[in-house]
Amino acid sequence: MRPKLPEQAREYTEFFRLCVPSAGVFAGAMSDKLTEIMAWKRQEIAPRIRAVSEDDLAKLDASLPRPPSFAAALQRGDGKLAVIAEIKRRSPSAGAIREGISATEQALRYQAAGASALSVLTDEKFFGGSLDDLRAVTARFREKAPALTCLRKDFMVHPVQIAEAREAGASAILIIVRALTDGEINVLFSHAKAAGLDSLFEIHNEAELERALHHGAKIIGVNNRDLSIFKTDLSLSERLIPKFPRAVIAVSESGIFNGADAARVQAAGAHAVLVGEALMKAPSPADLIADFRR
C-alpha cells in the first residue's frame, strides 16, 4: 500500500507553489551563511515542486525495498560510540576538502573501517554533493551491505526532497530546527514517517531542543558548529545532551577530530558522532574510527 501525503503537506505544497519565501522571512531566526543557504535552497527546489503534481508527490514506489533503520544503526549494544561517517567534498567553513573524490569509493572505505552509518551530502552549490552520489552509494551497498544505512544530508524545506531521498535509497533525512517554522517541521516529519524514513533533528540551543521534543523527535543531533557563523564549540554537546530524555538517541555533530573529542561528547551522553571533515582527510579512516571508540 502506498503511503499518502499528509494533508498538511498538501496544503504546504500549494502554499509553496504560490510563494517561495525569501531570505528576509527567516532573518529573525537565522543570519549570515545559513540564511543564504536556505534562501538558495528554496529557490533551487521551486522548479522541482512545480514539475510534479500532488499525486506524483504522494506516490512512493511500493516496489522499492524498505530502507534499513537509521535509528537501529545508532544503537550499539557494546557501549561504544556509533560513528556516522560523512561524505563531504567541501563546505563553507572548511572550503575544499576532497573535491574530486568518488562518493562510492569513499563509502567503501568507511564501510571497511567499521562505520555504523553513512551521511551523504546532496547539496551541490555549497557542499559539492548530489542526489546521484546518494543513489550511487545506496545502489552499491544494496547487495553487498544491505544493513548499512544512509542519511540524506541536505537543507530540507519541502516534502518533494523526502520523496527524492526515499527514491535514492536513504534511510533518514535531516531536519534543521533553526531553519524551519514549526509548521514546516511538522510537514517534513510527518511525510518522512509516511515514507518510512527516520529524521535526525539538528539543534544548537535549549529552545531548539524544546521544539524538537515538542514534535516528538526520536533522534536529536547537537551541531557543535553554529551554522550562522560556522564557529565550533564542543561544550554545546556537553551542555545540551544531558538534557535529552533517556529514550532519545543523542548525536554530536561537527568539530570531532580525534578520540579525545569523541570521549568528551560520549561522557556527556552521546550515543553517536557524525564526522565529515576529519574522516575525509584521514589517511586511515579505520584508525580514526577506532580512536573514536577507545
Residue ranges of each PLM-predicted region?
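Alpha/beta enzyme core
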Residues: 99-118, 144, 162-172, 188-198, ...
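Catalytic cores of alpha/beta
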Residues: 157-168, 206-215, 256-275
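Glycine-rich phosphate-binding active-site loops on the catalytic face of alpha/beta enzymes
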Residues: 164-183, 222-229, 270-288
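Short, low-complexity, charge-dense intrinsically disordered segments
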Residues: 1-27
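Alpha-helix-loop-beta-strand connector modules within alpha/beta enzyme cores
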Residues: 128-151, 186-201, 234-250, 292-294
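An N-cap/entry alpha-helix motif that binds or orients negatively charged groups
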Residues: 29-100
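Active-site mouth loops of central-metabolism enzymes
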Residues: 87-102, 148-157, 200-202, 252
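Hydrophobic faces of well-ordered beta-strands that scaffold small-molecule active sites
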Residues: 83-85, 118-120, 150-153, 173-175, ...
